[in-house]
Amino acid sequence: MAAAVQDSRVNPGGKLKRSPKKKKKMKKVAKAAVSKLEDELKDSSGGEGSCESEMDDSDDGAAEADSEDNVESCEEENEVAAESSAGTNSGWADAMAKILNKKTPKSKPTILTKNKELEKEKEKLKQERLEKRKQIDKKREWEMLCRVKPDVIKDKEAERNLQRIATRGVVQLFNAVQKHQRNVDEKVKEVGGSIRKRAKLMSTVSKKDFISVLRGMDGASENSSAGKSPKARQTEVKSEEGPGWKILRDDFMMGASMKDWDKESEGEEPADGQAGSASH
């Protein structure tokens, strides 16, 4: 056993680099040898002195081996840390060198914080929105200028007067149209059934005739309204509310002229024939 322990000892003078696996194996072997020696010492009672000396020698050897292993492990850890720090430093240095050696175009700034093109675009869009909003507000103010919401309670009489004026104007317009149509119909009857004379008559009819009729009715209505009493005016307004124009009447399409439209056209043909024979 002593020979086995002596063989397991490590020479302190020769420091060799060992792998962590070998170190673990050496520690296990040393512990196993120590445990065997202790068991033998307990069993054997005769050779205590020799066993104790061997135990002391083995303990010293194991302690020396452990100390050497700890020193070597510390050295290896320091070397690994130095290599890792050197690797990170070299990577950082490479990255910085790449950035510093990079050539930037003259149109773009070298410092990225000074590159404020996006901020300028955002500011420009903001200004455009503000200008559009100002234009819209200005347009609304112009549209709402001099607009006043009518008060139903205060402006009741004024609204009634305006309604009366509007109804009078509409009734007067329809009466003027009716009178103008009557005048045209009378002239057509005077002409007779000749199509040429009718066409000539219709060509002479213009807007001025209608406007003159409308103005004449306006003056006549003013004169008549000035000479009438208030009660007569009210009755006139009520009568004017009814449909005075032919088109607004219920029996407009049922008149005699519309029923006999084909007879009139037949009667016109011989008249044209007579006119032609007279010319010959």
Curated annotation (Swiss-Prot):
Positions of the UniProt region annotated as Disordered: 1-122, 217-280
Pfam assignment, any one: Rrp15p
UniProt organism field: Rattus norvegicus
Location of Phosphoserine modifications: 58, 67, 206, 265, 279
Residue ranges with Acidic residues bias: 51-80
GO cellular component: a single term: preribosome, large subunit precursor
Coiled coil feature spans: 21-45, 107-143
Membrane-spanning segments: none
Xref: PANTHER family: RRP15-LIKE PROTEIN
Modified positions (Citrulline) in chain numbering: 9
Entry keyword annotation includes Cell inner membrane: no
Keyword set, alphabetical order: Acetylation, Citrullination, Coiled coil, Isopeptide bond, Phosphoprotein, Ubl conjugation
Covalent cross-link (Glycyl lysine isopeptide (Lys-Gly) (interchain with G-Cter in SUMO1)), residues: 238
Name listed for the protein in its UniProt record: RRP15-like protein
Top-level taxon of the source organism: Eukaryota
